[in-house]
Swiss-Prot record:
Result for mutant: K26E: Almost complete loss in ability to inhibit human Nav1.7/SCN9A
Disulfide bonds: C2-C16, C9-C21, C15-C25
Record's keyword terms, sorted: Calcium channel impairing toxin, Disulfide bond, Ion channel impairing toxin, Knottin, Lipid-binding, Neurotoxin, Pharmaceutical, Secreted, Toxin, Voltage-gated calcium channel impairing toxin, Voltage-gated sodium channel impairing toxin
Effect of W5Y: 290-fold decrease in ability to inhibit Nav1.7/SCN9A, and decrease in ability to bind membranes
Protein family membership: Belongs to the neurotoxin 30 (phrixotoxin) family.
More about this protein: The ability to inhibit Nav1.7/SCN9A is greatly enhances by unatural modifications such as C-terminal amidation (5-fold) or C-terminal addition of -NHCH3 (25-fold). Such modifications also improve the ability to inhibit Nav1.2/SCN2A, but the selectivity for Nav1.7/SCN9A over Nav1.2/SCN2A is retained.
Compartments (UniProt record): Secreted
Chief location: secreted
Site (Part of an aromatic-rich surface that anchors the toxin toward the membrane core relative to lipid headgroups bound along the pore module of Nav1.7/SCN9A): W5, W7, W24, W30
Record-given protein name: Beta/omega-theraphotoxin-Tp2a
Naturally occurring in which organism (per UniProt): Thrixopelma pruriens
Length: 30
């Protein structure tokens, strides 16, 4: 499942974007 704080920018890891688990995510500048 996915949570708002589960952010990972890894091609092999899932990333949470809009409460949806994806296999990719855009790199974000904090």
């Amino acid at each position: 499942y996915c949570q708002k704080w589960m952010w990972t920018c890894d091609s092999e890891r899932k990333c949470c974007e809009g409460m949806v688990c994806r296999l990719w995510c855009k790199k974000k500048l904090w």
